[in-house]
């Protein structure tokens, strides 16, 4: 299953590279994330973490929305620097312009407690 996430991350980077006409450094990908968060972008470490439990329960939406959401954070950081807002206009530009997705801040997955 993580192979699908790896493939989607790569596809998102390729979309961003075609859109912006520049290369982006690929992040380390980890699946050590639990709890309510579906994904986290560690910008200064160039690392993406994904929640496999939420992925397994929401595969289609996770690949369509969550993975691009996190990649958009990485791309925005590489393009615009560290002083931008996490879900600010730069990130929203990438979500809408590159991925043609609504810039939702949070997922609506059911989370077990």
Task: Give the label of every model feature segment.
Residues 1-65, 74-113:
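Active-site-proximal or metal-binding-adjacent scaffold patches in catalytic folds
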């Amino acid at each position: 299953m993580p192979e699908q996430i790896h493939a989607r991350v790569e596809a998102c980077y390729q979309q961003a590279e075609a859109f912006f006409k520049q290369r982006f450094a690929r992040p380390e990908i980890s699946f050590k994330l639990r709890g309510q968060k579906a994904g986290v972008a560690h910008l200064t470490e160039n690392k993406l973490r994904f929640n496999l439990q939420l992925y397994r329960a929401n595969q289609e939406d996770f690949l369509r929305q969550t993975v691009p959401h996190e990649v958009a954070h990485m791309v925005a950081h590489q393009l615009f620097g560290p002083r931008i807002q996490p879900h600010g206009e730069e990130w929203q530009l990438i979500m809408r312009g590159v991925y043609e997705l609504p810039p939702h801040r949070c997922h609506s997955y059911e989370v077990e407690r």
